[in-house]
């Protein structure tokens, strides 16, 4: 493979892969090339020098999320494959195709969302490769091939232990059971029964090896059988190639089969019964020092195995016999021999050996002496006599081991046969799908006979695999019309010849050596050396004399031949057959049935190798008779932990699994296959003329290749096929073209930058010069201006100095004059001031005495008033606080509502009275305060008057006094009194201020209390309103409960004698069986309804029809016949009202059919509707009857009410509304009672409600079912019509590359291309428009139209969104733009349809709209998880966002998806969510339920006037229908 992938054109700057001992391959950049030596700068920082032939080119344009099919890789080589698997594994994409081979990497974590029922539904019938790789896709291909071609198929699951083979097998069988559709066999499906057999087969067929603690030591081929209809009819488990030698010989640190250790860990009574002990006491187990497995309890597994045996169908007696045989094998291994008395004879070695020999005979229920003779002697039959020959101890040991291996092999075969009988096989089945689960290639430090046989098996399977891969390659080349005659087939037949060729193969030489008693492993090895010394696949190690190596397809394996002869010997000894055939245990006898006569007469040599070869031949014959499919399971790490990818380990598994061999086969032909579109997009720049011309894609690709001069390529019908290395050459040339273009662009940019720099520099120079000249002129101007200013300053300064001298002289003269005049005035002023002061003192003293007396009196009055008001305010505050505490809570109990209302009313009255009292007290207090205020004002006025009089008297006294006032001697006593009075006045002022403050506080509290009282008053009024509403609700509920109870009792009594409509279809009945959560009907609530739904027959119906009814006479029967004949016709509509519904309703109301106990008119109407809608594809008829049925249902809903039962006391039960008729009639009382039945010609709302009997209620129920049925049929028809278009709308059709190139005809071409792009979307819009027009023309209620289109848009959302998440090619930028354009068409349709008919349909597309919005948004790496999940895509879950983010690829601009940090955060959130019980599926479910109830329909439809509806001509002239004629005004 390396040589075929060797690069032929690596240049400096190329990105390449180079080998690394730690991570297998590491990428780097070529820095230097010296001949065949290349110097590479690796990404880990190291510089590595390697040979040119040892490096591989790296595809830098590979998608960031990898490719789902590795044949799409530009470079199909080891590092490319490994890197692609690693990228996908990091994104939790565990499945990858290589052609039609599926590679499955064990995630070591639960991923339930990719295995649920939604995922199985998506892959059912999907073409292979259309959706993401999955094990379901392989199973679906196998199933479809079996059904279509009638040929059996097989699925080969391989991989080393721990790679997930068993889990993959489970998923395969689960999906096949899903497709096959077989229900249950004895309570368990076939798949379950097969899986339940696993613990038994693992206990007896699995063992610990060096690499795995639970390695299968046999191959398992599960056949799932199908009948002619494709349903599972049976299954069988075939086992192959059991490693029999392990029973007797094991190497350290391996273990023998699990069953031996399980039995040794059984309960004590079991151990005593079988005389067992610790495993180390038995020879067959103590050859290895490993007896227990870490973290595994053999005792627990023993119980689990016994339980599995019970499930499989093994009786207690059979289980006891099985473990008795297992114990016998352990004891048999402890029987040792020594030389006997005779020559070359042998006998049991000691008492211990005799004990074990006796125990074996006891357990097998055979004779001890016969057992000893069978082990130590041989019988030779000659024509003359029968000769008994003794065996030496070594031969006796070989005989013992042969017996042990034979017993164990027969026991294992019996177990498999028993399991097959339990599962049940179909002997008549001609088609089957087989699932092969077999051990993979093994290579250990010590490889013995077991590894030789296993690797021989894998060589055979690899040859089969190679042939299949080559066949697929041939089919691909033939399909594309490629010449492949010269391509060599990679085969491993030479290895198979080396092993199995007869004579002369290794197996034949081994059998030959085993036939000679004196042969040893040394002689056998020498024989091999001599025979195969020139064979290129056989290698003789230099440091060993007995080892040999074989160059297998997966690598060289060195075998140790020490135990080859012992492990290969498998004599068919008649003595053993006779011994166990004569056992007293029926189970043992069943293991050894009598042999054919010719076989029993001879002791023919048999070996395990030859048996192995025969079984392998049978397996290959089975596989060759089927069409194979391959699944290669890979274990990503030996730690068994998620998110750990060990490159070296996986690379070895890919080699061992043949994946790299398949790639080598592909590389022998044309490993690189590019569709024309991708090839032209990538390499069109190598020859632009091919793009400029209006060429087809194939012609353009051919011109590009011809211009390049590439050798060895071929152009197919849809792809370009390139030989190994040619892709690298094309990329190298492309890199050179891109480099030249980059250099040209850089040159242009540098020229442009230099030119810009020169222009900027020139502009700066000119600006600097202009600035300098301006500064110089400015300085000259400044000097001139300063000189003029200096002259002007000097002139002003001289003038100012002269003026200042004059002013100083003038001021000095004025100052002298002023001083003289002031002295004279000052003397006069001082004399007058002294005279006035004496007069003022005398006046103030007299005023002070009067004021003191007034203040003392005022203080006492104010103090007494203030304290009294404070006392009243505090008393009022206490009363308000007490009143506020008395407000209580309303009780919720229904029986206490009346008391609460009375109590609240009483409290309201008290509150009103208290408020009135408060207002009265407040008014009285205000009056008192006002009167006190008036008194105080009067007193103040009187005091003021006295003061005024005293002042006037004082003034007069002063004026009358003599002009010269003499100073009066003031006594000391008067001065002290004045001071005391002053202090008292100040104290009174302070007390007055305090009392004022208290009064203000009391006033403020009073205002607050008044506001609080107002709030409580408002709350009380609200409470009174609520109490009144609750009282009304209680009254209504009591009335409903009473009516429902009485109605239910009447209906139960009448239900026994009334038969329902026999014409109600099965679908209608199923529609009735819905839960009560949505308000729909449910027939599972009453057993009586089941009686009505299933017990009707024609005889009963005829009896009901023939029996004369009390409420109808013969004339009415004739009228009913005429009505039925009339409504069969298409009566059309009048004023948007369906005539049929209006006529039926009027007739039923006039005939009082709703109120009679028995009538057949309802059944006949329902029968007519059922017959009319039998043609489910005619949407016009369905819309017509949907309009009529919904209108009639509305009329019944607003007219009928359930009748009560006389003499029955109503009982209140909450559960009454949960019954069928409880829910059905709960809405009968929604309209107020009307006026009169005579007002039939008016609107529906003017009619009184009619008490309906059971037939009317049943009729309404059946009519409801038909409305829902017709609605579902219309919706499903529209879904069927648009489903094929949706599959085409999710991915943009590819356009010719020529249309993307500039040219004169580009606009015309683009217009046509745009029309072609949206053709599928326009088809959907056309279907929606036709359906809308059909519904509108039949006047279907807009409410139902909205519901239809809401569910249709939800269906579109689910289908497009699920397809987007399952197909990576759809998650591209350009495809997002395409779907966005299509969604715009749907939005435009919603706008044209208006909200009346489209409703919220556009909102139902929220998932696909947000997903598309994510695809087309720019700068995704800059978006944070919070922005994405809360702003851009708030509706999408983390699983859905993770799926889109990892599958996104930009085919237009080459941008990347969101940042790795966002991806890591999404993983953390998904891990946390995986612990919840909520499904982790990223797919959406389609809701096909009925999204409305009768109440919803009734509330949405407007009032219907039926009085002026003209009857049809058929009944217009009939006098019996005169009531249908409109009344004249």
UniProtKB/Swiss-Prot annotation:
GO biological process, one term: actin filament organization
Keyword presence, Metal-binding: no
Positions that bind ATP: 159-166, 212-220
Listed GO CC annotations: cytoplasm; myosin complex
Listed GO MF terms: actin binding; ATP binding; calmodulin binding; cytoskeletal motor activity; microfilament motor activity
Disulfide bridge positions per record: none
Amino acid composition bias (Basic and acidic residues), ranges on this chain: 993-1027
Main location: cytoplasm
All residue ranges annotated as the IQ domain in the record: 738-767, 761-790, 786-815, 809-838, 834-863, 857-886
One protein family per Pfam: Myosin_N
Start and end residues of each Myosin N-terminal SH3-like domain: 11-60
Gene3D superfamilies (alphabetical): 1.10.10.820, 1.20.5.190, 1.20.58.530, 6.20.240.20, Kinesin motor domain, Myosin VI head, motor domain, U50 subdomain
Region (Disordered): 993-1031, 1096-1115
Actin-binding as annotated region, ranges: 498-532, 534-557, 592-616, 616-638
Coiled coil: 887-1059
Compartments where found: Cytoplasm
Keywords: Actin-binding, ATP-binding, Calmodulin-binding, Coiled coil, Cytoplasm, Motor protein, Myosin, Nucleotide-binding, Repeat
PANTHER family: MYOSIN (PTHR13140), MYOSIN-11 (PTHR13140:SF767)
Subunit structure: Homodimer.
Family statement drawn from the similarity comment of this UniProt entry: Belongs to the TRAFAC class myosin-kinesin ATPase superfamily. Myosin family. Plant myosin class XI subfamily.
Domain note: IQ domain mediates interaction with calmodulin. The tail domain is a globular cargo-binding domain.
Protein name: Myosin-11
Gene behind this protein: XI-E
């Amino acid at each position: 493979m390396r040589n075929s992938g060797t690069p032929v054109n690596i240049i400096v700057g190329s990105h390449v892969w180079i080998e690394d001992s730690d991570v297998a391959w590491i990428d780097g950049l070529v820095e230097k090339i010296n001949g065949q030596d290349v110097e590479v700068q690796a990404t880990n920082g190291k510089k590595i020098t390697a040979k040119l032939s040892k490096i591989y080119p790296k595809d830098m344009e590979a998608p960031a999320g990898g490719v789902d099919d590795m044949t799409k890789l530009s470079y199909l080589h080891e590092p490319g494959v490994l890197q692609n698997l690693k990228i996908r594994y990091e994104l939790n994409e565990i499945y990858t195709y290589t052609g039609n081979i599926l590679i499955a990497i064990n995630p070591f974590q639960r991923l339930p969302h990719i295995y649920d029922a939604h995922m199985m539904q998506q892959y059912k019938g999907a073409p292979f490769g259309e959706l993401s790789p999955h094990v379901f896709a392989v199973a679906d291909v196998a199933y479809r091939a079996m059904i279509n071609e009638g040929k059996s198929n097989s699925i080969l699951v391989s991989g080393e232990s721990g790679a997930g083979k068993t889990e993959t097998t489970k998923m395969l069988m689960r999906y096949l059971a899903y497709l096959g559709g077989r229900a249950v066999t004895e309570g368990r499906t076939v798949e379950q029964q097969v899986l339940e057999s696993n613990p038994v087969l693992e206990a007896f067929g699995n063992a610990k090896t060096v690499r795995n603690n639970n390695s299968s030591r046999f191959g398992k081929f599960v056949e799932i059988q199908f009948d002619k209809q494709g349903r599972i009819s049976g299954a069988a488990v075939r086992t192959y190639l059991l490693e029999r030698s392990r029973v007797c010989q094991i190497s350290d640190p391996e273990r023998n089969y699990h069953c031996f250790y399980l039995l040794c860990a059984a309960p004590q009574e079991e151990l005593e019964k079988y005389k067992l002990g610790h495993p180390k006491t038995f020879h067959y187990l103590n050859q290895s020092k490993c007896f227990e497995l870490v973290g595994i309890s053999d005792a627990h597994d023993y119980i689990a195995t016994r339980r599995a045996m019970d499930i499989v169908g093994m009786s207690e007696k059979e289980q006891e016999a099985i473990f008795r045989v297992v114990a016998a094998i352990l004891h048999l291994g402890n029987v040792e021999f020594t030389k006997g008395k005779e020559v070359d004879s042998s006998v049991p070695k000691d008492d211990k050996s005799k004990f074990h020999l006796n125990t074996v005979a006891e357990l097998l229920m055979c004779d001890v002496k016969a057992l000893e003779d069978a082990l130590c002697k041989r019988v030779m039959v000659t024509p003359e006599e029968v000769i008994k020959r003794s065996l030496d101890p070594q031969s006796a040991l070989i005989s013992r081991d042969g017996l042990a291996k034979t017993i164990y092999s027969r026991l294992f075969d019996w177990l498999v046969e028993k399991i097959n009988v339990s599962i049940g096989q179909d002997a008549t089945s001609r088609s089957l799908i087989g699932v092969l689960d077999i051990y993979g290639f093994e290579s250990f430090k010590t490889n013995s006979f077991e590894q030789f046989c296993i690797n021989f098996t894998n060589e055979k399977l690899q040859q089969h695999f190679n042939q299949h891969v080559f066949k697929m390659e041939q089919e691909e080349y033939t399909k594309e019309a490629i010449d492949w005659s010269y391509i060599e087939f990679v085969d491993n037949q030479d290895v198979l010849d080396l092993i199995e060729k007869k004579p002369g193969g290794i197996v034949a030489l081994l059998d030959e050596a085993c036939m000679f008693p004196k042969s040893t492993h040394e002689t056998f090895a020498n024989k091999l050396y001599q025979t195969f010394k020139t064979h290129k696949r056989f290698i003789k190690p230099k440091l060993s004399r007995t080892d040999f190596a074989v160059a297998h397809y997966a690598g060289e394996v060195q075998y140790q031949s020490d135990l080859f002869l012992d492990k290969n010997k498998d004599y068919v000894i008649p003595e053993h057959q006779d011994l166990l055939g004569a056992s007293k245990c029926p189970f043992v006898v069943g293991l050894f049935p009598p042999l054919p006569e010719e076989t029993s007469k001879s002791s023919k040599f048999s070996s395990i190798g030859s048996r192995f070869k025969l079984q392998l031949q049978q397996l290959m014959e089975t596989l060759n008779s089927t069409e194979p499919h391959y699944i290669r399971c890979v274990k990503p790490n030996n730690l068994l932990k998620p998110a750990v990818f060990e490159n070296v380990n996986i690379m070895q598994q890919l080699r061992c699994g043949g994946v790299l061999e398949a790639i080598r086969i592909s590389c022998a032909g044309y490993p690189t296959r590019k569709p024309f579109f991708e090839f032209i997009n990538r390499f069109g720049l190598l020859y632009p003329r091919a793009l400029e011309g209006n060429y087809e894609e194939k012609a353009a690709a051919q011109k590009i290749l011809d211009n390049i001069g590439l050798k060895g390529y071929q152009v197919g019908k849809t792809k370009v096929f390139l030989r190994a290395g040619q892709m690298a050459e094309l990329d190298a040339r492309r890199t050179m073209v891109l480099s030249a273009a980059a250099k040209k662009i850089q040159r242009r940019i540098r020229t442009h930058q230099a030119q810009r720099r020169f222009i900027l520099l020139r502009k700066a120079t000119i600006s600097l010069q202009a600035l300098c000249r301006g500064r110089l002129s400015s300085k000259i101007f400044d000097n001139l201006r300063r000189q003029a200013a200096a002259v002007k300053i000097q002139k002003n300064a001289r003038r100012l100095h002269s003026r200042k001298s004059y002013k100083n002289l003038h001021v000095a003269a004025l100052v002298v004059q002023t001083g003289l005049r002031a002295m004279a005035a000052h003397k006069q002023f001082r004399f007058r001031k002294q005279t006035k002061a004496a007069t003022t003192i005398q006046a103030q003293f007299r005023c002070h005495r009067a004021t003191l007396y007034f203040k003392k009196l005022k203080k006492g009055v104010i103090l007494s008033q203030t304290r009294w008001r404070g006392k009243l305010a505090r008393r009022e505050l206490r009363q308000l606080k007490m009143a506020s505490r008395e407000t209580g809570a309303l009780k919720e109990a229904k029986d206490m509502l009346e008391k609460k209302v009375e109590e609240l009313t009483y409290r309201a009255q008290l509150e009103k009275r208290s408020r009135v009292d408060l207002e009265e007290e407040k008014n009285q207090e205000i009056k008192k305060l006002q009167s006190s205020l008036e008194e105080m004002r009067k007193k103040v006025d009187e005091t003021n008057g006295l003061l005024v009089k005293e002042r006037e008297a004082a003034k007069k006294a002063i004026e009358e006094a003599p002009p010269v006032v003499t100073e009066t001697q003031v006594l000391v006593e008067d001065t002290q009194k004045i001071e005391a009075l002053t202090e008292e006045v100040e104290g009174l002022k302070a007390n007055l201020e305090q009392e004022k403050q208290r009064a203000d506080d009391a006033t403020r509290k009073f205002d607050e209390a008044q506001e609080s009282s107002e709030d409580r008053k408002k709350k009380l009024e609200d409470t009174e309103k609520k109490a009144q509403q609750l009282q009304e609700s209680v009254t209504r509920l009591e009335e409903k409960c009473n009516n429902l109870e009485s109605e239910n009792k009447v209906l139960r009594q009448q239900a026994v004698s009334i038969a329902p409509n026999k014409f109600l279809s099965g679908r209608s009945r199923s529609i009735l069986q819905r839960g009560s959560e949505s308000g729909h009907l449910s027939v599972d609530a009453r057993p009586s309804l089941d009686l009505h739904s299933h017990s009707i027959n024609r005889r009963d119906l005829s009896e009901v029809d023939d029996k004369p009814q009390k409420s109808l006479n013969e004339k009415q029967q004739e009228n009913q016949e005429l009505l039925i004949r009339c409504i069969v016709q298409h009566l059309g509509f009048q004023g948007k009202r369906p005539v049929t519904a209006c006529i039926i309703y009027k007739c039923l109301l006039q005939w009082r059919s709703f109120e009679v106990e028995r009538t057949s008119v309802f059944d006949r109407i329902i029968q007519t509707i059922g017959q009319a809608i039998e043609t489910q594809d005619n949407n016009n008829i369905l819309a017509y009857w949907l309009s009529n049925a919904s209108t009639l249902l509305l009329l019944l809903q607003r007219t009928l009410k359930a009748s009560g039962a006389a003499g029955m006391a109503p009982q209140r039960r909450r559960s009454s509304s949960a019954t069928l008729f409880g829910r059905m009639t709960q809405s009968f009382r929604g309209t107020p009672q009307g006026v009169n039945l005579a007002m039939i010609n008016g609107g529906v709302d003017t009619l009184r409600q009619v008490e309906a009997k059971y037939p009317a209620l049943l009729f309404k129920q059946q009519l409801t079912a038909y409305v829902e049925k017709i609605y579902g049929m219309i919706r499903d028809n529209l879904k069927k019509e648009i489903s094929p278009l949706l599959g085409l709308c999710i991915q943009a059709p590819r356009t010719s590359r020529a249309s993307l190139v500039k040219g004169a005809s580009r606009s015309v071409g683009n217009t046509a291309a745009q029309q072609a792009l949206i053709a599928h979307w326009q088809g959907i819009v056309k279907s929606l428009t036709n359906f809308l027009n059909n519904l509108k023309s039949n006047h279907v209620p807009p409410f139902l139209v909205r519901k239809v289109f809401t569910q249709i848009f939800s269906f579109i959302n689910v289908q497009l969104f699920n397809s987007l998440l399952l197909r990576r090619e759809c998650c591209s930028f350009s495809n997002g733009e395409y779907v966005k354009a299509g969604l715009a068409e749907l939005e435009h349709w919603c706008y044209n349809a208006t909200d009346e008919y489209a409703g919220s349909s556009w909102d139902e597309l929220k998932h696909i709209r947000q997903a598309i919005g994510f695809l087309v948004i720019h700068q995704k790496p800059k978006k944070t998880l919070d922005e994405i999940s809360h702003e851009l895509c708030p509706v999408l879950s983390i699983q859905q966002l993770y799926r889109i983010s990892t599958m996104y690829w930009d085919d237009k601009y080459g941008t990347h998806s969101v940042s790795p940090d966002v991806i890591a955060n999404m993983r953390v959130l998904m891990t946390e969510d995986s612990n919840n019980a909520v499904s982790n599926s990223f797919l959406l479910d389609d809701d096909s339920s009925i999204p409305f109830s009768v109440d919803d329909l009734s509330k949405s439809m407007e009032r219907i006037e039926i009085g002026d509806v003209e009857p049809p001509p058929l009944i217009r002239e009939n006098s019996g229908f005169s009531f249908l004629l409109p009344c004249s005004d």
